[in-house]
Amino acid sequence: MAESLMDIKRRIASTKKTGQITSAMQMVSGAKLSQIEKNSVAYQVYTDKIREIVTHLAASQLIDIARQKSSLQAEPADSTIKKAIKHEVTLSNLLVERPIKKTGYLVITSDRGLVGAYNSSILKAMVQMISETHQSPDEYAILAVGGTGADFFKARGMNLTYEYRGVSDVPSFEEVKQIIKTAVAMYDNGVYDELYVCYNHHVNSLTSGFRAEKMLPITDLDVSEVADQNLEYITEPSVDDALDAILPQYAESLIYGAMLDSKTAEHAASMAAMKSATDNANNLISELSIKYNRARQAQITTEITEIVGGAAALE
């Protein structure tokens, strides 16, 4: 049954309203993206500097000395999550690789939809990675940041150890500090033996890609980065005290940097999704307008024909 002119007009009006909403949401996402990109650039300066300091220590063999001392002093880790989370992270646990009995995954997703394939790409990659790597839920622990991921893992009966919802659109370190410290403390307490942060990495406004970065233990320092620099250090009060202060900050900075990157990708995905929705609304309005004009033209033609026919009948 053909649509009436009134039905077409209602669809045009409804689509225009939807397009206005998605256009406004696109602009909001664009503003959030711009803000978090500025924050990310500023934070990268801090991350680069603390990495440089830690790499200097590695190149000057201070970390190697501490690692050797720590490996002799390290005690078996308590693997129960019920143990009270420490506030002081053990230096030996951050530096020394141990047998991998359990892997931790800090998975970052959004709390809401309307972000295109942002969440689905992360969750699909996580399911594939876990199924290929682990034989049972006892071999991994999931820490979910974002309601979408938490609900997904719960619905599938996967080993969800920790969840956090409600991260703001432009998170500060103070806001997410407890998430980061909890993840590091769980590793320190032996809840898992290595920690990966899994998220969508922001490439540009149109592109992002899944990443699973190993954050703990700290083993990815490349001393060649500072090979041509002066590496003589005078440490006060001791090497261990310096590393006790710097290494937890370094680990936390890596995780926070990943969270900023993930939020940047989320806003970019939201902006792209809303732009696509707005474009689709505009295209649909154009199609409906053409359809309306044709229907109106046909109606006018019919009316003229009826008038002419009626006039001819009266002659």
From Swiss-Prot:
MF annotations from Gene Ontology: ATP binding; proton-transporting ATP synthase activity, rotational mechanism
Cross-referenced PROSITE patterns: ATPASE_GAMMA
Pfam families: ATP-synt
One GO cellular component term: plasma membrane
Signal peptide: none
BP GO terms, sorted: proton motive force-driven plasma membrane ATP synthesis
Gene3D superfamilies (UniProt xref): 3.40.1380.10, ATP synthase, gamma subunit, helix hairpin domain
Family per record: Belongs to the ATPase gamma chain family.
Role description: Produces ATP from ADP in the presence of a proton gradient across the membrane. The gamma chain is believed to be important in regulating ATPase activity and the flow of protons through the CF(0) complex.
NCBIfam families cross-referenced by the UniProt entry: ATPsyn_F1gamma, PRK05621.2-1
Subunit description: F-type ATPases have 2 components, CF(1) - the catalytic core - and CF(0) - the membrane proton channel. CF(1) has five subunits: alpha(3), beta(3), gamma(1), delta(1), epsilon(1). CF(0) has three main subunits: a, b and c.
Record protein name field: ATP synthase gamma chain
Organism: Latilactobacillus sakei subsp. sakei (strain 23K) (Lactobacillus sakei subsp. sakei)
